[in-house]
């Protein structure tokens, strides 16, 4: 647990506003159920209520998603992030019923997660708005690739959700545009390697210093690109190892970063200011 504990402390010291164990960057797809819960438990213990912990508990099985979310709730997670079911490609009504079942079975705040390039299904704004009416479905991380989805979701919201339901970017390269349309921040890949810069970027925009946010966004764009030069989280794990933040390696079917991409990733992160 040494590397995980150290990464958490680094994030808290760098101004990160919340920790998301068992998201995509945490290799959630290749950890078994027990490992998922061990990582979530350890994260909650180390964070010790200093910042929120949003546990990744999504599954393409509704029963499994309910179980994981109930377990994370019992461990003390502040919220749970649930990706849309992947591979089985449910309809919009299927998505609604999936999240309704999870909401009905839990009390922990739920953050929806829409990432069509990885899951094969795209949760539409109208479906999000229907789900936002559940008291414990509090927000969405959207990585559909269309920043204007923020506007579509906000326009579709009704009742109390118009004020209470939040939207977060799941696409680092589009975070600035999404915040201009009303997103409240991001659940970020780049923050895993440049937490202080990403924190400053978001905080600058949200406090009204849009000029500073734009400068930082421009500075960070090469990093956003580099961290997806191969399947994420491969580049992220490689550069964290290079920076001495963790040991190298990644679980199959992903493989270590190709030699041909080392320089691009290293230069992008170093130029932007790794660890500063």
Segments predicted by a language model, with ranges:
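Short helix-capping segments at alpha-helix termini
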Residues: 45-51, 75-76, 106-108, 133-136, ...
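Active-site beta->alpha loop and helix N-cap motifs at the rims of alpha/beta catalytic domains
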Residues: 1-120, 128
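Conserved, mostly hydrophobic/aromatic
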Residues: 11, 43, 72, 102, ...
């Amino acid at each position: 647990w040494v590397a995980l504990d150290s990464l958490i402390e680094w994030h808290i010291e760098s101004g990160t506003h919340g920790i998301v164990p068992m998201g995509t960057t945490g290799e959630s797809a290749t950890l078994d159920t027990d490992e998922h819960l061990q990582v979530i438990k350890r994260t909650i213990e180390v964070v010790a209520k200093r910042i929120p912990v949003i546990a990744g508990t999504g599954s393409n099985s509704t029963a499994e998603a309910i179980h994981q979310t109930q377990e994370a709730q019992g461990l003390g997670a502040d919220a749970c992030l649930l990706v849309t079911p992947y591979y089985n490609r449910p309809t919009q009504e299927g998505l609604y019923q999936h999240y309704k079942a999870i909401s009905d079975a839990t009390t922990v705040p739920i953050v929806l997660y829409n990432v069509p390039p990885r899951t094969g299904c795209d949760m539409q704004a109208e479906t999000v708005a229907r789900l936002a009416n559940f008291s414990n479905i509090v927000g969405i991380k959207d990585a559909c690739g269309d920043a204007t989805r923020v506007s579509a979701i906000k326009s579709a919201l009704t009742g109390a959700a118009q004020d209470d339901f939040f939207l977060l970017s799941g696409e680092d390269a589009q975070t600035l545009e999404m915040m201009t349309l009303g997103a409240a921040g991001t659940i970020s890949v780049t923050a895993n390697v440049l937490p202080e810069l990403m924190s400053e970027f978001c905080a600058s925009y949200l406090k009204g210093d849009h000029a500073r946010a734009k400068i930082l966004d421009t500075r960070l764009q090469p990093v956003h690109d580099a961290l997806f030069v191969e399947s994420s989280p491969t580049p992220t794990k490689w550069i964290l190892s290079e920076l001495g933040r963790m040991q190298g390696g990644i679980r199959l079917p992903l493989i270590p970063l190709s030699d041909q991409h080392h320089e691009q990733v290293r230069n992008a992160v170093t130029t932007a200011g790794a660890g500063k």
